[in-house]
């Protein structure tokens, strides 16, 4: 596996979206930044908050796009292009309707599954979809017409605690991810459930 050089956390900017389910990916990157004692600072040319740390001699960049979700690819393409980061070296953390709260899954490649952030990233990367994904379960409202309000809403406390636990599980497999042990990371993460 190619070493991960960029970890992207998807979300929407602004106080009104700060604690919503759609910002699950941003929560993950914020937690990495805190653990690594990295400040996430605004970078206009990358359309987001960025940070950097070194893991065993390898630079790892963090990005939370400050564009709206459906323009996330603008930020990812700008940063990846500037630092010449291959698509295969990108990990995108995002909310996942098809998984219940408390479950996180790793995946390589695939479609966007209706997720507008992933859709734009794939488009902005020249229709390349071979980046890695961390899918953070938020559950589904049960009716497709309720999805928008659901993802842009705040989770009840018990649900948020499960999401936080799934982020903890994902943080726990980062050493395997950085070591290129993708299968071990998947096995360990996929056996966890809050």
From Swiss-Prot:
Residues the record marks as site: Discriminates between blocked and unblocked aminoacyl-tRNA: 12
Chain residues that bind tRNA: 17, 68, 70, 116
EC main group: hydrolase
Keyword annotations: Cytoplasm, Hydrolase, RNA-binding, tRNA-binding
GO molecular function, one term: peptidyl-tRNA hydrolase activity
Location of the protein in the cell: Cytoplasm
Superkingdom, taxonomy of origin: Bacteria
Site (Stabilizes the basic form of H active site to accept a proton): 95
EC number: 3.1.1.29
InterPro entries found in the cross-reference section: Pept_tRNA_hydro, Pept_tRNA_hydro_CS, Pept_tRNA_hydro_sf
One Gene Ontology term from the biological process aspect of the record: protein quality control for misfolded or incompletely synthesized proteins
Claim: Hydrolase is one of the keywords in the record: yes
GO cellular component terms, semicolon-separated: cytoplasm
CDD domains: PTH
Active site: 22 (proton acceptor)
Keyword field contains Acyltransferase: no
Catalysed reactions listed for this entry: an N-acyl-L-alpha-aminoacyl-tRNA + H2O = an N-acyl-L-amino acid + a tRNA + H(+)
Chief location bin: cytoplasm
Family note: Belongs to the PTH family.
Role of this protein: Hydrolyzes ribosome-free peptidyl-tRNAs (with 1 or more amino acids incorporated), which drop off the ribosome during protein synthesis, or as a result of ribosome stalling.
Quaternary context: Monomer.
Protein name as annotated: Peptidyl-tRNA hydrolase
Species this protein is from: Pseudomonas syringae pv. syringae (strain B728a)
Top-level taxonomy: Bacteria, Pseudomonadati, Pseudomonadota, Gammaproteobacteria, Pseudomonadales
């Amino acid at each position: 596996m190619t070493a991960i050089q960029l970890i992207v956390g998807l979300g929407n900017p602004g106080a009104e979206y700060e604690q919503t389910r759609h910002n699950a990916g941003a929560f993950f990157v914020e937690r990495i930044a805190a653990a690594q004692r990295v400040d996430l600072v605004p970078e206009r040319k990358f359309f987001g908050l960025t940070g950097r740390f070194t893991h065993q001699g390898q630079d790892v960049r963090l990005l939370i796009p400050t564009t709206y979700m459906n323009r996330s690819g603008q930020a990812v393409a700008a940063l990846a292009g500037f630092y010449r980061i291959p698509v295969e070296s990108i990990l995108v953390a995002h909310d996942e309707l098809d998984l219940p709260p408390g479950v996180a899954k790793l995946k390589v490649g695939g479609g966007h599954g209706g997720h507008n952030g992933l859709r734009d990233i794939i488009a902005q990367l020249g229709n390349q979809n071979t980046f890695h994904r961390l899918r953070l379960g938020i559950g589904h409202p049960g009716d497709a017409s309720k999805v928008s309000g659901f993802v842009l809403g705040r989770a009840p406390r018990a649900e948020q605690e499960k999401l936080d636990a799934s982020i903890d599980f994902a943080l726990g497999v980062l050493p395997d991810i950085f070591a290129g042990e993708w299968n071990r990371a998947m096995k360990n993460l996929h056996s966890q459930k809050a």
